């Protein structure tokens, strides 16, 4: 029955497996039952009865194990349910707070977007910023990926039941949950980044407003104190913002560290839980081993009962089963011998342990005794130690340092007094600065209100001026159009007058050339004809220059006739001189620029007078006297001359009156020209000036026509005069004509001056036209400036609103600063109280310091002596240390030799035990004389060696490569899977690749 028993015993190692192996063993089809010896059976009914009893016992054991496993599994299920409940609660809390965070961030974003729309409405469209810095708009909370149904289940509102979230988690896979949660985390990050960007945008806007306030403060006449105060407030604001950002960074860093520590705590908790689970597994293994031990104890009791029954059978029966019973008795004796050997070995080991325990207790006692001796050391021994001397040296050093500290303490006292005084002064300065800042703030508020009132007044003035300018521009439109038409017509008229003047100049040159020819002919005929022909030729040739120069003058009085009585040839000479003068005057007229015509025309009048006087002096000495030819005809023409004389005198009177009128009109023209030059260039004055110019030109044309008529009449009447009286009258008339010609030359010069002034006025008119164009351009620019002023006014109103808000904020900041100042005053009072307490403690410390300084002075001498002793002991210590270094290798060698001896002793004991076993075997050989029995016994021993020492049922078919001990593969694998990864014999640890199958043939 040993064969089937061994086959059935293969399931011994699988009894009572751990929890992790239950599922694997449930899949196996074979049920492993331990072998049991039924003993002698007489019938099949008895065999069935014993088998049923054995099955019932096994089922009872399995039932107990099953109940224990169920209890343990129930406990673990409860723990897992609790853990799942806590995990669900944490997940729900995280989900709720995450949803609250998303809602608050969305509310903040909506608030910032509404504020951004309100603030960006008055700004230019080019200055508006996008939602993000790089231009990529973030998805809206309602239009993003979060509209997916699964993510909407993952992020329910607060009113939704919490089961929906858990159901969504259970319904979706881990990958889907991870993807959706990653999208939700990206949305939260994007929303938070948008909030941060909005805060940065608000910060930039505040800085821009501050810059505008500074620029406005630079442009407006604000006080320097207010500007400095605003700058200080701006700097303080920036400092507080930097401090806030630093604190936020610090808070963020601390929160990250806190989260890391929390993660570490959670990981540690999970490790603790894992360790608890491992402890539970170990406890389960211990329970398993305990159950196995109980089972083995039961088997041992049964075996003892069977042995007793075997003794009884061997005593009662004869030789039927005698060989088998004697063999079991021998095995039992061998087991008893091995048990005795093991007991002896255990007793020896116990003796060794007791010996080591006694040595340990002795060492502990010596240690305690040395501690007590160390506590109650005498002073002399302490003084002789090197540590004491080192302490003395250190004491001397510390004494010197204490002296230095004393000096530093004195300095600190002085510094404390100085700091106290400076602190008091600083407090006074702070109070005075606070009062000054309050006054400055009040004055600044008053100034801001004044500036606001001034800005309102300026706005009203600008609005009124803008309305007036609009009305004036609307009224001046048709007037400007009329003035443009009038200016264009006057320009055309000026061009026509210039053409007429050129034509008249050309005719004047032609007439002067004809006069020269006639003079040459007259001079030739005067030499060839008789004396009677001279007066006629002279009379004919005399009026020609007058015609060309502009007409004769009035007849002179009888006194003038007597003065002008010399030779009648003076007319020709005077006309020739006038001709010579006219040519350069025309050249001068053509060479004068428009800007210099006025002064040159005025300067010709004083130059013409000496020339006329020179001609009057040269005139009598040039021509021959024609008096003899005129005496014969004087009587004939006497009556006619008297009539003509009366007519000419009347005519001359009329001409003189017209000449006076022309001179008066010329004076009026000069006055108008002076007024035009001095007065501003306006349109109505120009129109009046042009009208006066036309009138003067019309009068000049009338005078020219009348002079021509008078010349023609004079030419007709001069042919009739032949006698002396006529010649005398002619001479007088010629003198008067010459005088009138002089006046005519002066009037021509004045006319030329007037023409030049007309050119100047034309040029001035063109300049005025250009100026009108510039004025129109300026009007357009003014309109643009008015529109710009209106836009700037709108912006100023917005800035004023912002400034008012900033003013309110500054008022709140001032209140906060006042509260801070009060808190600082309280802290200052507390610091003063602390300072008083410190001064009291400082006095006590000073007293203690004086006492200690005295003690230090007393101990100074001892320190010197201790230093000398320390040097001596130092030498001795070095000597002892050298000896100790020499002794240490010897101690190490002796320790190694002792360990070697102990190892050899253990080996000797093992050899003794092995030899003892051989001796017992030899004794068995001596006892058993039969060789078959000896061989059978050796075969059993070899089989026992080939069986696994752990389960004692299976063959050895696995080796551990760490220590090369051999076991069965099932035991090794069971130990590996049960996490008992140590060799059963030598406790050497092994891994998954450290055991392999072997095949023993």
Swiss-Prot record:
Provide the free-text tissue specificity comment from this protein's UniProt record. Ubiquitously expressed. Expressed at higher level in testis, heart and pancreas, while it is only weakly expressed in lung, skeletal muscle and small intestine.
Location (main, coarse): nucleus
Superkingdom, according to UniProt?
Eukaryota
Crosslink Glycyl lysine isopeptide (Lys-Gly) (interchain with G-Cter in SUMO2) sits at which residues?
Answer: 578-579
For bias type Polar residues, the affected ranges are 522-531
Specify whether Ubl conjugation is a keyword of the entry.
yes
Spans annotated as Disordered: 1-32, 116-146, 518-652
**Which cellular component terms (GO) are annotated to the entry?**
HULC complex; membrane; nucleoplasm; nucleus; ubiquitin ligase complex
Q: Which CDD domains match?
A: RING-HC_RNF40
Give the protein's biological function: Component of the RNF20/40 E3 ubiquitin-protein ligase complex that mediates monoubiquitination of 'Lys-120' of histone H2B (H2BK120ub1). H2BK120ub1 gives a specific tag for epigenetic transcriptional activation and is also prerequisite for histone H3 'Lys-4' and 'Lys-79' methylation (H3K4me and H3K79me, respectively). It thereby plays a central role in histone code and gene regulation. The RNF20/40 complex forms a H2B ubiquitin ligase complex in cooperation with the E2 enzyme UBE2A or UBE2B; reports about the cooperation with UBE2E1/UBCH are contradictory.
Protein family according to the UniProt entry: Belongs to the BRE1 family.
Entry protein name = E3 ubiquitin-protein ligase BRE1B
Phylogenetic classification of the source organism: Eukaryota, Metazoa, Chordata, Craniata, Vertebrata
């Amino acid at each position: 029955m040993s064969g089937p028993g061994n086959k059935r015993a293969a399931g011994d190692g699988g009894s009572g497996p751990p929890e992790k192996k239950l599922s694997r063993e449930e899949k196996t089809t074979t049920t492993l039952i331990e072998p049991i010896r039924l003993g002698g059976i007489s019938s099949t009914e008895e065999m069935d009865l014993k088998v049923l009893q054995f099955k019932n016992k096994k089922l009872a054991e399995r039932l107990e194990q099953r109940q224990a496993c169920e209890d343990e599994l129930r406990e673990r299920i409860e723990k897992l349910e609790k853990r799942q409940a806590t995990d669900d609660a944490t997940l729900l809390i995280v989900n709720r707070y995450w949803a609250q965070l998303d809602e608050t961030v969305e509310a903040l974003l909506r608030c910032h977007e509404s504020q951004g729309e309100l603030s960006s409405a008055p700004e230019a469209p080019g200055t508006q910023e996008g939602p993000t810095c790089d231009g990529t708009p973030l998805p809206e909370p309602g239009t993003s990926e979060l509209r997916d149904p699964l993510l909407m289940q993952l992020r329910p509102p607060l009113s939704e039941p919490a089961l929906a979230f858990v159901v969504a988690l259970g319904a979706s896979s881990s990958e889907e949950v991870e993807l959706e949660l990653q999208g939700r985390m990206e949305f939260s990050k994007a929303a938070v980044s948008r909030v941060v960007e909005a805060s940065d945008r608000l910060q930039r806007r505040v800085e821009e407003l501050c810059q505008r306030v500074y620029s406005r403060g630079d442009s407006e006449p604000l006080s320097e104190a207010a500007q400095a105060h605003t700058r200080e407030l701006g700097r303080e604001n920036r400092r507080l913002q930097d401090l806030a950002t630093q604190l936020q960074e610090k808070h963020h860093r601390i929160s990250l560290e806190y989260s890391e520590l929390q993660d570490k705590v959670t990981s540690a908790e999970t490790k603790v839980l894992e360790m608890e689970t491992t402890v539970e597994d170990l406890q389960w293994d211990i329970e398993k081993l305990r159950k196995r031990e109980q089972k083995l104890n039961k088997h041992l009791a049964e075996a003892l009962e069977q042995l007793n029954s075997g003794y009884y059978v061997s005593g009662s029966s004869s030789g039927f089963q005698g060989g088998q019973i004697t063999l079991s008795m021998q095995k039992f004796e061998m087991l008893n011998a091995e048990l005795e050997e093991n007991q002896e070995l255990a007793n020896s080991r116990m003796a060794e342990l007791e010996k080591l325990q006694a040595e340990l207790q002795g060492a502990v006692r010596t240690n305690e005794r040395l501690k007590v001796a160390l506590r109650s050391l005498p002073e002399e021994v302490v003084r002789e130690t090197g540590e004491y001397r080192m302490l003395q040296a250190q004491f001397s050093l510390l004494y010197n340092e204490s002296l230095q500290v004393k000096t530093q303490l004195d300095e600190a006292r002085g510094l404390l007094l100085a700091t106290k005084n400076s602190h008091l002064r600083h407090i006074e300065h702070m109070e005075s600065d606070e009062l000054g800042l309050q006054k400055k703030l009040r004055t600044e508020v008053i100034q801001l209100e004044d500036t606001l009132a001034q800005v309102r007044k300026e706005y009203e003035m600008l609005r009124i001026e803008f309305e007036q300018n609009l009305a004036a521009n609307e009224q001046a439109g048709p007037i400007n159009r009329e003035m443009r038409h009038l200016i264009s017509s006057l320009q055309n008229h000026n061009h026509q007058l210039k053409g007429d003047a050129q034509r008249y100049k050309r005719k004047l040159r032609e007439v002067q050339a004809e006069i020269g020819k006639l003079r040459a002919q007259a001079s030739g005929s005067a030499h060839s004809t008789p004396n009677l022909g001279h007066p006629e030729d002279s009379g004919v040739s005399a009026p020609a220059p007058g015609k060309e120069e502009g007409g004769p003058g009035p007849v002179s009085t009888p006194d003038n006739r007597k003065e002008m009585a010399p030779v009648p040839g003076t007319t020709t000479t005077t006309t020739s001189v006038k001709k010579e003068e006219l040519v350069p005057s025309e050249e001068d007229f053509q060479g004068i620029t428009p800007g210099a015509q006025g002064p040159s025309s005025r300067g010709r009048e004083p130059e013409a007078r000496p020339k006329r006087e020179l001609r009057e002096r040269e005139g009598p000495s040039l021509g021959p006297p024609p008096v003899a030819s005129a005496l014969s005809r004087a009587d004939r023409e006497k009556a006619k001359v008297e009539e003509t004389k009366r007519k000419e005198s009347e005519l001359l009177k009329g001409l003189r009156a017209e000449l006076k009128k022309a001179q008066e009109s010329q004076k009026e023209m000069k006055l108008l020209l002076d007024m035009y030059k001095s007065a501003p260039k306006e349109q109505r004055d120009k129109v009046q000036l042009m009208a006066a110019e036309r009138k003067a030109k019309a009068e000049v044309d009338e005078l020219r026509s009348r002079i021509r008529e008078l010349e023609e009449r004079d030419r007709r009447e001069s042919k009739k005069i032949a006698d002396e009286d006529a010649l005398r009258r002619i001479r007088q008339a010629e003198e008067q004509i010459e005088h009138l010609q002089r006046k005519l030359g002066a009037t021509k010069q004045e006319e030329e001056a007037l023409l030049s002034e007309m050119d100047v006025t034309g040029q001035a008119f063109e300049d005025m036209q250009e100026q009108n164009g510039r004025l129109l351009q300026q009007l357009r620019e003014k309109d643009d400036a008015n529109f710009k002023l209106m836009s700037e006014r709108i912006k100023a109103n917005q800035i004023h609103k912002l400034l008012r808000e900033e003013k309110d904020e500054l008022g709140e900041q001032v209140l906060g600063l006042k509260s801070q100042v009060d808190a600082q005053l309280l802290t200052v009072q507390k610091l003063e109280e602390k300072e008083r307490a410190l001064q009291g403690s400082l006095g006590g410390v000073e007293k203690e310091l004086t006492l200690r300084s005295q003690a230090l002075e007393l101990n100074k001498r001892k320190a010197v002596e201790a230093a000398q002793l320390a040097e001596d002991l130092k030498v001795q210590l070095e000597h002892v240390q050298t000896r100790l270094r020499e002794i240490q290798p010897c101690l190490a060698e002796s320790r190694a030799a002792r360990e070697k001896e102990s190892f050899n002793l253990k080996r000797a004991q093992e050899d003794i035990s092995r030899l003892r076993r051989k001796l017992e075997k030899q004794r068995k050989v001596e006892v058993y004389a039969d060789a078959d029995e000896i061989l059978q016994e050796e075969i059993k021993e070899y089989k026992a060696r080939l069986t696994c020492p752990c389960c004692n049922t299976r063959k050895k078919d696995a080796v551990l490569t760490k220590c090369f001990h051999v076991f069965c593969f099932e035991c090794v694998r069971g130990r590996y899977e049960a996490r008992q990864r140590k060799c059963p014999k030598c406790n050497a640890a092994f891994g998954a690749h450290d055991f392999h199958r072997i095949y023993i043939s």
